[in-house]
């Protein structure tokens, strides 16, 4: 996947979340531990979102790329973020957003993916 395709998917999901009433806190939050594509909140929920973008489903569903190792890395980065920001009184969840950009755009958003 090209960087520009991934960036396009992240922009699409950012807009999708805003339409659903979320506010984006961070995009491409990076530490030495890894990266989280989008951090957004709505009410007392903070969602750490991994975005997977593909041109087709020829090689399987995009969410299949979020394996156990990737999940562990996301947990570590999120824990770092929570501690750094001193976040309390929030519920946290990990979501996966799939974007297929083919003849038509398809979005599949999975709340509490892991």
UniProtKB/Swiss-Prot annotation:
- The protein's name is UPF0102 protein Amet_2739
Top-level taxonomic group: Bacteria
Q: In the record, what terms sit under GO molecular function?
A: nucleic acid binding
Write down the Pfam families for this protein, in alphabetical order: UPF0102
Query: What intrachain disulfides are recorded?
Result: none
Q: List the source organism.
A: Alkaliphilus metalliredigens (strain QYMF)
State the family named in the UniProt similarity comment for this chain: Belongs to the UPF0102 family.
